[in-house]
Curated annotation (Swiss-Prot):
It comes from Saccharomyces cerevisiae (strain ATCC 204508 / S288c). Residues 15-87 form the J domain. Belongs to the DnaJ family. GO terms for cellular component: cytoplasm; Prp19 complex; spliceosomal complex; U2-type spliceosomal complex. GO terms for biological process: mRNA splicing, via spliceosome; spliceosomal complex disassembly. It is found in: Cytoplasm; Nucleus. Its main location: cytoplasm. Keywords: Chaperone, Cytoplasm, mRNA processing, mRNA splicing, Nucleus, Spliceosome. Belongs to the CWC complex (or CEF1-associated complex), a spliceosome sub-complex reminiscent of a late-stage spliceosome composed of the U2, U5 and U6 snRNAs and at least BUD13, BUD31, BRR2, CDC40, CEF1, CLF1, CUS1, CWC2, CWC15, CWC21, CWC22, CWC23, CWC24, CWC25, CWC27, ECM2, HSH155, IST3, ISY1, LEA1, MSL1, NTC20, PRP8, PRP9, PRP11, PRP19, PRP21, PRP22, PRP45, PRP46, SLU7, SMB1, SMD1, SMD2, SMD3, SMX2, SMX3, SNT309, SNU114, SPP2, SYF1, SYF2, RSE1 and YJU2. This is Pre-mRNA-splicing factor CWC23. Involved in pre-mRNA splicing. May be involved in endoplasmic reticulum-associated protein degradation (ERAD) and required for growth at low and high temperatures.
Length: 283
């Protein structure tokens, strides 16, 4: 019964989106509501974790049952809203507690005696990030994946003007030395996206959930040179131009985030005249 399943899931503090390897909603506006995709994910993972393939592995059998539970709840229109409300509130409280602990630790570190030697670069990075966290908390803004600081990724993001909207989440078959960045870049350029030029793939980074030695597939976030290139790759995939070694391609920022976007900005009068070729009167 879904009601009993929901109670058990909440008692165990389970994130069913993680179970199905789907994006976790951060608020009511970002709830993942693509039911066909949920069912496709279930079928793919159920084949991978089916007990018949792993009869002597209790953790795999448990994973298989969790997949069924997650699918039952996330595809049930009556039960899912209750679960989503609980999960969003639970994650908010958990993240607030963890973030406050980090902020407190940062404040204690910053208020301590200034050392005579130059601080370690990682400490400087954490201190700068702590300042950002406090600002985001003050203005009640979302703060993303603040637990994992990657200096190189942040530097790359700062150098690319459209880093996030040029990024696609690519699930592809695991391959030899897939955890090596240069090897992975070469694989993407020479084996996967062979119609693209080398400079159209700007950067890549890996999902922290990748298990390179055991999993059949891995997740690579691929940053293209422009949003137009990323859009071209995604549209090709969505229109049925499949790539044999690729299991899924999706935007880093889910499309439904923009489903109700209707912001209109009025042009400055001078710009409007330029667009319409009207003369600009000088004082």
């Amino acid at each position: 019964m879904p009601g009993h399943e929901l109670e058990d899931v909440i008692n165990q503090r389970l994130n069913l989106y993680d179970v199905l390897e789907l994006p976790t909603p951060l608020d009511v506006h970002t709830i993942y509501d693509d039911l066909p995709q949920i069912k496709r994910k279930y079928r793919t993972l159920a084949l991978k974790y089916h007990p018949d393939k792993h009869p002597d592995n209790p953790s795999i059998i448990h994973k298989f049952h969790l997949l069924s539970t997650a699918t039952n709840i996330l595809t049930n229109a009556d039960v899912r809203p209750h679960y989503d409300r609980w999960l969003i509130e639970f994650l908010r409280k958990t993240n607030d507690i963890e973030r406050n602990k980090l902020i407190q630790k940062l404040e204690e570190s910053e208020s301590s005696t200034i050392p005579t030697t130059t601080p370690h670069p990682d400490l400087l990075q954490i201190q700068r990030h702590g300042e950002l966290l406090r600002k985001l908390k003050h203005f009640n803004l979302p703060y993303g994946d603040w637990k994992h600081l990657n200096t190189q990724d942040q530097e790359n993001a700062s150098q690319h003007p459209y880093y996030d909207c040029s990024t696609l989440r690519i699930v592809l078959d695991n391959f030899l030395q897939s955890n090596n960045k240069s090897n992975c870049l070469s694989h993407l350029r020479n084996q996967v996206f062979i119609t693209l030029s080398a400079n159209e793939i700007y950067d890549i980074y890996f999902s922290e959930r990748n298990n390179y030695s055991k999993d059949d597939s891995i997740i690579i976030y691929t940053v293209f040179d422009t949003p137009i290139t990323a859009q071209h790759v995604f549209r090709n995939w969505s229109s049925g131009n499949l790539i044999p070694t690729v299991k899924d391609i999706s935007p880093l920022i889910p499309l439904h985030y923009y489903s109700d976007f209707n912001l209109e900005t009025e042009l400055n009068d001078d710009i409007a005249r330029l667009v319409s070729n009207e003369p600009i009167l000088l004082d």
